[in-house]
Amino acid sequence: MWFKNLQLHRLPAPWAVTADRMEKWLAPHAFQPGSSVEMQRVGWASPRDDGALVYSINRQMLLVFRAEKKLLPASVVNQVTKARALELEEQQGFKVGRKQLRELKEQVTDELLPRAFSIRRDTRVWIDTANGWLVIDAAAQALADDVRSLLVKSIDGLPLAGVQVARSPVAAMTDWLLSGDAPGGFTVDQDAELRSSGEGGATVRYVGHALEANDMRRHIEAGKQCMRLAMTWDDRISFVLTPSLTIKRVTPLDVIKEAADPTAQNDDERFDSDFTLMTGELARMLTSLVDILGGDRQDSVPQPAAA
């Protein structure tokens, strides 16, 4: 249930959009399996496999972006194309030109696509309409871009914005390393990456290692800055902070795992409970994180009329 990565975006808080309105926006872009000759197909899928494209509880929504892609390695296409080109050269008595080779490669690709295996990958999107967050569970920026692209295409006038904080995450993480601690209920853990901004970009990584203040000071005085820092919030959630405010390796700790509702009687009730717990904890953590970075500088975003 828990998101592993948090690509953060801002919405108006509150955002007056209902689950029914969201469902109508997404429906024209529902996922449909690709044809035998399509390389890739994307769309919205049901989070609970019940036909609904939006799962909603307590003003929190869950969406699922589904991508289907044909597995057709370039090496296979190139190998078959090369063999076809040799055959063609023998037939016509001269070397295949660039244009002819390109056309041959396209022909080979079209022939192989129907026989290629397909793989589907789902990416979850959490929308907190109460607190104005839209969060994509994606580690790779390219995947997050694909999800955002479909969101913008699907949702009329989506008032989406980046998170703008008063203090640079790099400057803040570097200062926290120097002091060995972070404010606001956050603690510094034992993973960090420091990188020089100079030529060559000399990099030092610590993994599961005590971050001694003297070592950190030596690296920072040499011109390095902290580019990744493992942290824990309120002894409840551990994560890795990055310069772009993308949060990675999100892990709920024991105190949260023990808070799971023991009275849930079935899968639906457990899902409701787990999603409510996750969104509540993450919303509180994100508020605290923005606070220790000087607050949210995002200008007020125009809000669409309530649906």
From Swiss-Prot:
The keyword Cytoplasm applies. GO terms for cellular component: bacterial nucleoid; cytoplasm. It comes from the Bacteria. Keywords: Cytoplasm, DNA recombination. GO terms for biological process: DNA recombination; regulation of DNA recombination. Its main location: cytoplasm. One of its GO terms (molecular function) is double-stranded DNA binding. It is found in: Cytoplasm, Nucleoid. Pfam families: RdgC (PF04381). Belongs to the RdgC family. HAMAP family: RdgC. May be involved in recombination. This is Recombination-associated protein RdgC. The lineage of its organism: Bacteria, Pseudomonadati, Pseudomonadota, Betaproteobacteria, Burkholderiales.
